Amino acid sequence: MINYSIIDKYIDRLIDDTTPDKPIWNIENIKHGKAPGWNYIDGCMMTSLYTIYKQTDKKKYIDFIDKFVDYYVFDDGSIRGYALDTYNVDNLNEGRVLFDLYRETGKEKYKKAIDLLYSQVQGQPRTPIGNFWHKKIYPEQVWLDGLYMAQVFYTRYEAEFNGGKNFDDIARQFQNVYDNMYDKQKRLYYHGWDYSKKAFWCNEKGLSKSFWLRSVGWYTVGLVDTIGYMPDSAKEQKAKLVAIFKDTIEGLEQYIDKDKKMFWQVVDQGERRGNYLETSGSAMIAYAMMKGARLGVVDKRYAKVGEEVFNGICKQYLTESDGKLNLGGICLMAGLGPETNRKRDGSFEYYISEPIVENDAKGTGPFVMAYTEIKQL
């Protein structure tokens, strides 16, 4: 039996050791000496902490989130370290917490920042069939992670400020990914799709080579969070997303390691030499399974399956050293290209070559997300 109270202490340590300009969880920035800026990694953590605040009603959580985000958002709504003209969908993810902060604090600058980010959504370059490019520097490319980064923010804006006028567009972008990036035999999604079929990493269909766990995790979480924010009045669009989500979750279940109850870094390659059980993607799928069961969009038994995956992570990678908890088994980063970085070619060998770290928010954020669902079982 896992002692979940130690996870509360772990979360508190992350908060206590962090300032807005030096978040302890952003290992990638620390490793590369990057200046702090608006990013999806902090966004993932802020969203998780806000959920904990709503569950516990402990003021320290909302105070921390407000102080953290306030540092990045100026009075005119401009955002420290954010450049709209890069059209990078990753930058939309941290915008999710702005909706909550605007409601909690009434600070107009948060609404102005929301509108700034929505202007990116409106101008984001698209493929000919309507999907957002992942970034301006990656023409015609759709990455699974981008559906989480953009569509959840997009859905919240539509639901809260635009009367749901673009719910069709949101559902269509998920449907396009399902139709073009889903391997119906393996029941898994490829990481990337180049509509133009020009990228060095793609095959004749424009697809990358492998099934990278965290990208599948991002997409799955993107689906369930979008479903959660889309109102019941959007009946047709929501039904489309629920059908995709059910097929996705049912397809993933077969890849859970029977002994360790986690997923592998390259999902379908199991114990192939160099492959490893990976924390961030496992936590995301655990979260999606439990949340999907709670929302009633997948069979209730997935609450138990998700709980087992979460407990598998705790047993495998949650350790104590010098009185402090550490969460390991986290892939630091992975991507596709650009042309100047041909190492990032979507191969099995590439995905297992990226650093494995402890306590990075790409793992701790989803871990805390999954924990918020554990607390609702």
Question: What positions do the PLM features span?
Answer:
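CBM-like carbohydrate-recognition segments
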Residues: 2-41, 55, 60-62, 71-89, ...
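Short, solvent-exposed segments of well-ordered alpha helices
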Residues: 32-36, 85, 137, 141, ...
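Extended ligand-binding groove/face enriched in aromatic
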Residues: 63, 74-202, 337-344
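Extended ligand-binding clefts on enzyme/binding-domain cores
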Residues: 144-145, 152-268, 275-283, 301-348
